[in-house]
């Protein structure tokens, strides 16, 4: 589940990302440090709402076995914000909610997804199927060629950025994925970044994903909500 960490060192603004994410070191309850890519409400279109969607999506993704960096709730105190030397970045944090969302930084071996030219391994194909099933079911339209939100190290993928998920109200003509004609809409499955390599999959290929989905109870969903800070 989502654990809360305290921001203790600001490193820099990330080069990419429409939400203006930052690289920073955070301290766990144990005293250990973890390096995170963190985003805050000032950079999200829906402010705190976008962070809530991101956090719940990340918790769901972990339970469903998707390859996602470990997620955290990031607390930024006034004392921490005061240590940020860059005035624009300091003001950005001052204008954000005191809680942000952070993902553990991936190793440098990961870069933006490039579709493999050769044979795709069974493990990579299984991960790709889980990702496309997740994005379809939980209404994430934000994994396309122009905005991959998918990292790759040549063997494994990692999914990032889910602040647009769970927002079917923002998609014109959206239909639930289990209804007829759902993928004939403007958010069609064919536009998904992983459609080409998963095309031809049959229902039985998604058995593992569906089994994990069936294990997510109402009580577990309530735990997701409880992990979101009220303030």
Protein language model regions, located:
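Conserved ATP-binding subdomain of kinase catalytic cores across diverse folds
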Residues: 1-114, 137-141, 154-155, 162
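Short, structured coil/loop segments at alpha-helix boundaries
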Residues: 82-89, 93, 117-125, 186-187, ...
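C-terminal catalytic region of ATP-dependent kinase domains
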Residues: 153-231
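Glycine-rich loops and low-complexity Gly/Arg-rich segments
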Residues: 61-65, 93-98, 126-130, 158, ...
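A general structural signal for short secondary-structure boundary/capping elements
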Residues: 69-71, 145-150, 204-208
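Short, low-complexity, polar/charged sequence segments that are solvent-exposed and flexible
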Residues: 55-59, 89-90, 120-125, 171, ...
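A short, terminal or domain-edge coil/loop segment
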Residues: 19-21, 121-134, 195-206
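Conserved kinase catalytic-core segment
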Residues: 109-171
């Amino acid at each position: 589940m989502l654990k809360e960490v305290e921001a203790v060192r600001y490193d820099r603004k990330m080069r990419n990302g429409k939400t203006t994410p930052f690289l920073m070191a955070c301290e766990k309850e144990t005293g250990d440090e973890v390096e995170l890519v963190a985003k805050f409400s000032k950079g999200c279109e829906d402010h705190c709402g976008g962070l809530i969607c991101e956090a719940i999506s990340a918790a769901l993704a972990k339970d469903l076995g998707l390859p996602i960096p470990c997620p955290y709730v990031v607390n930024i105190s006034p004392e921490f914000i005061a240590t940020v030397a860059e005035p624009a970045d300091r003001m950005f944090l001052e204008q954000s909610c005191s809680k942000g969302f952070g993902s553990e930084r991936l190793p440098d071996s990961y870069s933006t997804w490039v579709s493999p030219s050769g044979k795709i391994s069974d493990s990579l194909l299984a991960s790709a199927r889980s990702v496309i099933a997740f994005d379809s079911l939980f209404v994430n339209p934000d994994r396309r060629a122009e905005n991959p939100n998918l990292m790759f190290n040549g063997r494994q993928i990692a999914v990032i950025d889910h602040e647009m998920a769970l927002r079917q109200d923002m998609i014109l003509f959206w239909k639930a994925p289990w209804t007829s004609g759902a993928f004939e809409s403007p958010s069609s499955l064919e536009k998904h970044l992983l459609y080409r390599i998963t095309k031809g999959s049959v229902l039985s290929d998604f058995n593992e994903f569906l089994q994990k989905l069936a294990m997510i109870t109402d009580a577990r969903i309530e735990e997701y909500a409880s992990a979101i800070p009220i303030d």
